[in-house]
Amino acid sequence: MIRAPFFFFSRALSGTCLGVWLGTQAILAADWPQFRGPQRDGIWDETGVLETFPREGLKIRWRHPIGGGFSSPVAAQGRVFVSDVEMNKPSAKERVHCFEQKTGRVLWVYAYAEKYGEWAFVPERGAGPTATPIVDGDRLFVVGANGYTHCLDVKTGAVLWEKNIGREYEVAEMSCRPSPLVEGPLLIVFTGAKPGASVLALDKQTGKEIWKALDDPVSNSSPIIINAGGRRQLIVWSDSSLASLDPANGRVYWREPMVTSNNDSVATPVFHRNRLLVSGLMLDVSADPPAAAFLWPAIRVPSKRILSNTSTPILQGEYIFGAKGWGELVCLEAATGRQIWSTNSLTASKNGASMNITPQGGAFFLFTDEGNLIRAQLSSAGYREISRAHLIDPTWPFLQTKYVYAPPAFSNRHVFARSEAEVVCASLEAGQ
């Protein structure tokens, strides 16, 4: 393996089901089966959720110790899945935990030995899996830090197939950070593998390679699928380009050079009404056949295209809400990129500040790097905080401050958050 340069941090979270949560009344409960939710857009559609938090804070249903990693929890079929690493120098063991959603009871744990470099045992380096697992039917797909990919049985944790991408291809050490996605019969993984296999499509039933594409270096950004220009498009933001691929065969529709440092290409692309927002770059992708037209910024300097190197913004109608450097939350005009307002009231963190924004029920949940969950109204008129509660203690040390970076999962009127020490479930159910 090639040794990857030290990365500042890693970023690395469909369908609905009828379920019963802590009671006998059946409710429509949305699973959160992959990175950033059912549609991979960060939106939580459940109702019956708290509008304000109790004075004493959120009710913690359960918590369980885990190891290091930046992958998000996922929740599906009454279960919660979290990947981590158990570090016992000089050895490392990557694991997948399955918990019962209601109680936190451990249902199964799958573990395998993985080779970690000497540098990975320094706490500030942030070792462990970053790619968030994805649930698809009765299968759970997990990608490890070095690309070791497993397909596990959701109920038992039994291995259905495995593929060690880090051994079969040329992959930079500890670099497989983007979260996988499922597209029809394919499991698509972005690992930066070479030669020509930066993006790989695998048969999700067998793990067999179906196609490979690009020679781009991997980034921290997870790919998405959009419908635009009359086509399904796979959008991939690497450390050297922004590309649109045909998810069926890997053919490139369009590609724009977009060189960044290893710290910058973090945000997941966001798509809404033919607009594609990639951190601080806005494109129109309505053309048929597929093509991209720049809307803003006018200056094609990499630094001008980065809104935040820690967080993914939210595109809501004609406005964008997202983190900006040094702990700011900003509102931008979607058509022009013009900043309308900013506030520093969410987090005391500056360098490395992070905000995960989740629209829900006409308001928003914001999860900060300090482990706080905030309920707020966001509009072009400004930021109005409704409630704030501490959810989980930050544990990852950087520059004499501790952070928690993994975005939480929201399911069954509950929130699930993880640090490098534990996973926590708290109730957001109204009327409890």
Regions inferred by a protein language model and the residue ranges of each:
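N-terminal secretory signal peptides that target proteins for export/translocation
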Residues: 1-10
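Bacterial N-terminal signal peptides
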Residues: 10-25
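Noncatalytic, solvent-exposed loop/strand surfaces
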Residues: 27-432
